[in-house]
Curated annotation (Swiss-Prot):
Antenna. This is Pheromone-binding protein 2. Signal peptide: none annotated. Homodimer. One of its GO terms (biological process) is response to pheromone. This major soluble protein in olfactory sensilla of male moths might serve to solubilize the extremely hydrophobic pheromone molecules and to transport pheromone through the aqueous lymph to receptors located on olfactory cilia. It comes from Lymantria dispar (Gypsy moth). Belongs to the PBP/GOBP family.
Length: 35
Protein backbone atom coordinates (compact mmCIF):
# COMPACT_ATOMS: atom_id res chain seq x y z
CA UNK A 1 0.00 0.00 0.00
CA UNK A 2 1.05 3.61 -0.37
CA UNK A 3 0.79 3.91 3.41
CA UNK A 4 3.51 1.31 3.91
CA UNK A 5 5.77 2.98 1.38
CA UNK A 6 5.17 6.31 3.12
CA UNK A 7 6.27 4.80 6.44
CA UNK A 8 9.39 3.46 4.74
CA UNK A 9 10.13 6.87 3.26
CA UNK A 10 9.82 8.54 6.65
CA UNK A 11 11.92 5.87 8.35
CA UNK A 12 14.79 6.16 5.90
CA UNK A 13 14.39 9.81 4.96
CA UNK A 14 14.23 9.01 1.26
CA UNK A 15 11.61 9.60 -1.44
CA UNK A 16 9.16 6.74 -1.86
CA UNK A 17 10.03 6.25 -5.54
CA UNK A 18 13.72 6.00 -4.70
CA UNK A 19 13.01 3.35 -2.08
CA UNK A 20 10.89 1.39 -4.56
CA UNK A 21 13.73 1.47 -7.07
CA UNK A 22 16.37 0.47 -4.54
CA UNK A 23 14.34 -2.38 -3.12
CA UNK A 24 12.57 -3.37 -6.31
CA UNK A 25 9.72 -3.17 -3.87
CA UNK A 26 6.27 -4.54 -4.19
CA UNK A 27 3.98 -4.35 -1.17
CA UNK A 28 4.71 -7.85 0.12
CA UNK A 29 8.46 -7.23 0.15
CA UNK A 30 8.04 -3.89 1.86
CA UNK A 31 5.67 -5.24 4.50
CA UNK A 32 8.02 -8.11 5.29
CA UNK A 33 10.86 -5.62 5.61
CA UNK A 34 8.89 -3.38 8.00
CA UNK A 35 7.63 -6.26 10.15
Amino acid sequence: SKDVMHQMALKFGKPIKLLQQELGADDSVVKDFLD
